[in-house]
């Protein structure tokens, strides 16, 4: 796909859609310094990483959860969860993008208010998914949670692009992805695995419910970072135009 895009799509002039003329390319160190000078970039970086810690942890362990708690085979769990995650994940991202496109021009704080709302509203649904005994109700709760969990990506990535200058947008996204993968993908599944081992002696096979609950609710901690970033995001976005 990368080769196809490279050979068929013309590279647009950087900054041609910005209000100000494109600035000359800055050194990576200078570009990073300029990014972190905007406090909302720092907060969205770690808010998004904590949000991802929750999502990655649940995604990795959800199949084991379905096997242990609901007695499904790994094949059945893969079909059910895989299809639901694909369909409703796409819906969540599209819906998140649609909402933030309409709200952020009125107030840039919606770039961070929206993922905050998604995290807070999604929290009770992940608890319902983990603790409901009826499979149909548990899966319905998962669908609602997953639409909200996937949807946070749209406002977060949109904000990162809005904060970065035309010559440093790739660096801004790369730094975000590095942080998200370092914290979210490295720590999220490991945290659930560690808690599984610790809680299994007390709760048996049901211990996975509690370990996934801890990881699932870390996205609420991300709200603290999002709301802190919302205090300066309007000024930071305006200074990037």
Per-range role (PLM):
Residues 38-96, 148-157, 184-193:
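Extracytoplasmic gate region of multi-pass secondary transporters
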Residues 74-78, 166-176, 205-208:
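Loop-to-transmembrane helix entry/capping segments in MFS-fold secondary transporters
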Residues 108-156:
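C-terminal transmembrane helical hairpin of 12-TM major facilitator-type secondary transporters
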Residues 92-108, 196-197:
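Helix-to-loop junctions at the C-terminal end of transmembrane segments
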Residues 12-45, 69:
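Juxtamembrane intracellular "pre-TM" segments in multi-pass secondary transporters
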Residues 73-76, 110-113, 196-219:
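A membrane-interface helix-boundary motif in multi-pass transporters
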Residues 1-19, 225-230:
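C-terminal membrane-cytosol helix-exit motif in multi-pass small-molecule transporters
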Residues 14-28, 105, 229-241:
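Intrinsic disorder in cytosolic terminal tails and internal cytosolic loops
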């Amino acid at each position: 796909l990368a080769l196809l895009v490279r050979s068929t799509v013309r590279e647009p002039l950087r900054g041609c859609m910005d209000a100000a003329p494109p600035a000359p390319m800055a050194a990576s160190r200078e570009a990073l310094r300029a990014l972190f000078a905007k406090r909302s970039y720092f907060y969205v970086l770690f808010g998004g990483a904590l949000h991802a810690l929750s999502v990655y942890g649940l995604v990795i362990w959800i199949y084991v959860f379905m096997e242990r708690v609901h007695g499904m085979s790994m094949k059945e769990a893969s079909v059910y969860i895989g299809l639901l995650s694909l369909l409703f994940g796409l819906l969540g991202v599209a819906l998140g993008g649609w909402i933030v496109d309409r709200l952020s021009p009125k107030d840039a704080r919606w770039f961070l208010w929206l993922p905050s709302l998604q995290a807070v509203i999604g929290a009770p649904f992940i608890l319902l998914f983990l603790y409901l005994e009826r499979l149909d109700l548990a899966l319905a709760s998962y669908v609602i949670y997953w639409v909200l969990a996937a949807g946070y990506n749209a406002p977060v990535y949109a904000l990162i692009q809005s904060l970065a200058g035309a010559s440093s947008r790739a660096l801004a996204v790369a730094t975000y992805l590095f942080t998200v993968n370092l914290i979210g993908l490295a720590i999220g599944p490991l945290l659930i695995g560690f808690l599984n081992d610790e809680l299994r002696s007390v709760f048996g096979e049901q211990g996975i419910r509690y370990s996934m609950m801890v990881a699932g609710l870390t996205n609420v901690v991300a709200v603290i970072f999002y709301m802190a970033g919302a205090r300066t995001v309007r000024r930071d976005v305006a200074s990037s135009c």
